Amino acid sequence: MAGAKSTRTERPSAKGERVRLASVIAPFRADATEDTKPSGRAGKTGRARTTQHQVIPSGAKKARLPEKLFPQLATLVSAAPTTGDWIYEVKFDGYRILTRIKHGKPALFTRRGHDWSSKMPALVEQLRTLGIKSAWLDGEIVVMGKDGVPSFNALQNAFDRARTADIQYFLFDVPFFEGYDLRQVPLRDRRRLLKTLLETRATDKIRFSDDFAGDGTSIFAAACRMKLEGVIAKRADAPYVSRRSKTWLKLKCTQRQEFVIVGFTDRKGERTAPGIGSLLLGVHDDAGKLVFAGSVGTGWSTETAADLKRRLVALEVKHPPFADATKPKSGRWSRRSAVPERWVKPVLVAEISFSEWTPDGQLRHASFEGLRMDKPAQSITRERALEPELAGRKPLRR
């Protein structure tokens, strides 16, 4: 994948970018055409080694496969970068999953290192057919909705209903491969290796996450028009680092993030009523203290509402789960429910979309997207988008 020049004289049209983005989900969409192909940039590997019919790029080092690997995470930014050599991938609406293949046996791990292999036996078996003896692979699992676009709710339902055979696995990186540590190899060359591997061995459930080179603003706009979650911008020359970095940037089409569920209200204010009226939400501040962030009262089905109530009643406590043990107050910019609020142990995490934050730190026009079983409540903080020019000034903590 040859490096793209940072100065471009032609700006691709939003329509053209939508056509190219359509190829990412072409196997699932009826409106995709054969000529919708992503960039597929090939990198110069210099002196390289060959193993298992795969070219190991220059910069790789012989190394033992680690038992655990913390993933590289992206920094939220407000706009696409305007300088540097960047590639763009679809931001899939799913769960981050890393695969360790040891002695030919795959195991699936969440970003926090929990082994989910038993939850997705069909995917484990398909990974086994790749014929890899030793590797760490990085990607995202998704389930496609009826419109052919990744659906977080459909993914959650797949786990809740034990229908994980519907899951697709989009791979986008390979930090370790067949006895080599590739983390210091430039991204473009790691992805070239992964793409070559999957061109001949990909299955109907395991796919390469294609990238797009070009004007990031147009690519992002096209992704939003296609109702995708957003895009990920990655520096083509960057190494793989096990922390949140500023060589991977995420741009979201809507405001959306995880929140800790701190309580709920009953539907119509009746404790015996099925379902719930609203969820009460919180995030951790810079000091690590849990603070109130508002509520959400829409976005769930009758079935989901009943499931949420069963989970929450089992976690109920007498007092609000905040550091000062006081009930949060209504702010000027938000309204609190008139019905009694019931508090719970702050262990469940929900994905919430919303229009904006109010000046007093609460959500407006929020909608429930689903539970996040892959992220611990202690890690949930308010996401703040950086300007892209500021993203590279100093490193972020993990």
Residue ranges of predicted features:
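Catalytic cores of nucleic-acid ligases and guanylyltransferases
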Residues: 1-398
